[in-house]
Design a protein with these regions (language model features):
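N-terminal alpha-helical transmembrane segments of multi-pass membrane transport
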Residues: 1-73, 79-91, 95, 101-102, ...
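Membrane-core helix-loop-helix motifs of multi-pass transport proteins
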Residues: 134-228, 390-430
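Short helix-coil transition sites and intra-membrane helix breaks within transmembrane domains
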Residues: 23-26, 64-67, 78-88, 117-128, ...
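Membrane-interfacial loop-to-helix junctions in multi-pass transporters
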Residues: 3-6, 61-68, 94-109, 140-147, ...
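Core transmembrane alpha-helical segments of multi-pass membrane transporters/permeases
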Residues: 52-88, 274-311, 325-333, 337
Length: 430
């Protein structure tokens, strides 16, 4: 009986991969999967009514609370950078530094974007930066697929340090009550990953600019807002520096960075001005990630249900899963394309069930599993996949086809993912 139920679970898992790849509404898909797997778990004797009532559909979303707070604060911080003029000033300086070299200007804008998203988070922050960056890139004659692709890959480049996303992933990949702790070991890898990821962007820009000559004289004036003092431009990386050097937690780090931003940009002249700015940016920041939070809360229901039925799936899949860490990292690197369209290698989709199965079958620690699963999410899902909201926005804003966007970015994303899986094996599993 349990073998039959395990096969049914596997069929529903494959059906969900197909559903996610269409793409369809994932929030509803995750809810239906949680219902299905809970029901099958009841038949298999691994799930009780108490589990359904308390652990899956109540404990899943409510247990996500701390991570939701991190996401909201990351999104708010992104809005602070835009509203205070810090983001605009950094971008303007990058354009001036690039001079009459469109390719260099594109690379500098990508670097600025990557640094901003080491701390900022959310679709709203991406859009707010994108509406400044894209007109500059396009006015320089940079091809639209390259402008959209390099920008989206730059957003993903910063996410190796981004505590909003790192904590989001840690919450999703919890084993029981245990979560992966983001510490010095991860930050050492993040520095290497950032460098390799950004190098892939540079190579992508250089190769595409050779094929498509752009001219600096095509540049048009773009309003990026007021100038702020040079010291204020340290704000985007301040929370990361505080976390690495002084072990300051995410929320205090962001609060200190916000205070620093307000003081250095001259926004502390009156209490009412501070109140208006903080209130507006916080409201906008929460609005920006509302749907993201909804999706992630339904994902938690699915995660909890997957955890309850892992005993039915593990006996079927365990014999075919590699028991070698090197082979597992190698396979994830070779098949990272399966993170596309919420497939089996992204935890923000069908890959959540695979994580539960791999964790149960191998017994490997989170210190190994976390980088194994995070890399394809960060290099493929957040950078390139059209199901990621900000990627789809960039494609629409620049008016490029999904096909051209993918042709420009996917080869570099896949190579980057493979290299990073090999690096992660050396740093976390050897």
């Amino acid at each position: 009986m349990q073998t039959i139920l395990g096969i049914i679970l596997l069929i529903t898992f494959l059906a969900f991969i197909y559903y996610a790849a269409r793409p369809r509404n994932l929030m509803l898909g995750l809810f239906v999967m949680a219902l299905l797997w809970s029901g099958i778990g009841v038949l298999g004797g691994t799930v009780t009514w108490t589990d359904i009532n308390t652990t899956i559909f109540d404990g899943g979303p409510t247990g996500f609370g701390p991570t939701a707070v991190y996401i909201i604060f990351g999104s708010w911080f992104g809005r602070i950078l835009v509203e205070t003029g810090i983001a605009g000033t950094i971008i303007r300086n990058a354009v001036e530094l690039g001079g009459d070299k469109p390719g260099l200007t594109c690379i500098l804008l990508n670097l600025v974007t990557a640094l901003i998203f080491t701390t900022s988070y959310g679709p709203g922050a991406v859009v707010a930066i994108g509406v400044i960056v894209f007109p500059i890139m396009l006015s320089l004659g940079i091809p639209k697929p390259l402008a959209a692709g390099s920008f989206c890959m730059s957003v993903g480049c910063g996410l190796y340090f981004n505590q909003s996303l790192l904590n989001q992933a840690a919450g999703a990949m919890a084993i029981g009550e245990e979560k992966y702790a983001i510490g010095s070991e991860w930050y050492a890898f993040a520095a290497v990953a950032f460098a390799i990821h950004f190098l892939s962007i540079v190579i992508m820009v250089m190769l595409n600019m050779k094929k498509n000559k752009a001219h600096a004289w095509a540049a048009a004036s773009v309003d990026t807002g007021k100038n702020v003092p040079a010291i204020a431009m340290l704000t985007p990386i301040l929370p990361v520096l505080l976390a690495i050097v002084l072990k300051v937690s995410m929320i205090p780090g962001i609060l200190l960075a916000v205070i620093f931003a307000l003081v250095t940009t001259g926004n502390c002249k009156s209490w009412s001005k501070i109140a208006d700015l903080v209130q507006k940016t916080f409201h906008d920041g929460v609005s920006d990630v509302g749907l993201v939070l909804g999706f992630l809360m339904f994902l938690q229901m699915f995660c909890k249900s997957a955890g309850m039925i892992k005993g039915l799936l593990a006996p079927i899949l365990a014999p075919i899963l590699p028991n070698s860490m090197f082979l597992m990292f190698l396979l994830f690197g070779l098949f990272s394309v399966l993170a596309m369209y919420r497939g089996p290698l992204t935890i923000w989709g069908a890959g959540m069930a695979l994580f539960v199965i791999v964790a149960e079958a191998t017994g490997w620690p989170l210190a190994v599993l976390y980088p194994l699963f995070y890399i394809p999410c960060c290099t493929i899902n957040t950078n390139i996949c059209p199901t990621q909201s900000w990627n789809m926005w960039a494609i629409g804003y620049t008016q490029v086809s999904v096909k051209d966007f993918m042709k420009t970015t996917l080869p570099f994303g896949l190579i980057c993912a493979f290299i990073l899986e090999m690096v992660a094996y050396v740093m976390f599993a050897m």
